[in-house]
C-alpha cells in the first residue's frame, strides 16, 4: 500500500519525468532486453536494436500507461483493467517480466535524475511499480 508520502514522491518524480516518459521507458526496455535476453521472446516481430522505432513505440505505450497509473494511484485496478486483461489473456506475459522491467526502469530513472533519486524516492517508486505489476498480473489467477 502506498502511503501519502509515497504518493507524493511518485507524483513529484513523474511530473519531472514529464515528456521524457516514452524515452525513459524505451531505454528501460532496451536495458531489459540486453540484461535479460529471455524477455525478447515476447517481441519476435520487433526490431530490438538500439533506437528501434518499434521499441520506442512500445516505450510510448508503456509510458502512457504509467502516466495513467500515476493519475489514479488510489484506484490502479480500474485504471489498468484493460491492460491487465490484455497481458493475462491475449499476450500471456510471464509475470516475472513486469518485475524485470520495473527494475530496469528504476535504473533508468536513477541515471537520468540522480539528485532527485533519493533512497526514499527509490522506495516509493519501487512500491508503485510493484503495485502496477500486481494489478497487471491480477487476472492471471
From Swiss-Prot:
Job of this protein: Involved in oxygen transport from the lung to the various peripheral tissues.
Binding positions for heme b per the UniProt entry: 87
Binding partners and assembly: Heterotetramer of two alpha chains and two beta chains.
Name of the protein in its database record: Hemoglobin subunit alpha
One Gene Ontology term of the molecular function aspect: oxygen binding
Family: Belongs to the globin family.
GO BP: hydrogen peroxide catabolic process
Phosphothreonine modifications at: 8, 108, 134, 137
One GO term describing the cellular component: haptoglobin-hemoglobin complex
Signal sequence annotation: none
Domain of life: Eukaryota
N6-succinyllysine sites (modified residues): 7, 11, 16, 40
Keywords, ordered alphabetically: Acetylation, Heme, Iron, Metal-binding, Oxygen transport, Phosphoprotein, Transport
Domain annotation Globin: ranges: 1-141
Amino acids binding O2: 58
N6-acetyllysine carried by residues: 16
Tissue and organ expression note: Red blood cells.
Entry-annotated residues carrying Phosphoserine: 3, 35, 49, 102, 124, 138
PTM-bearing positions, type Phosphotyrosine: 24
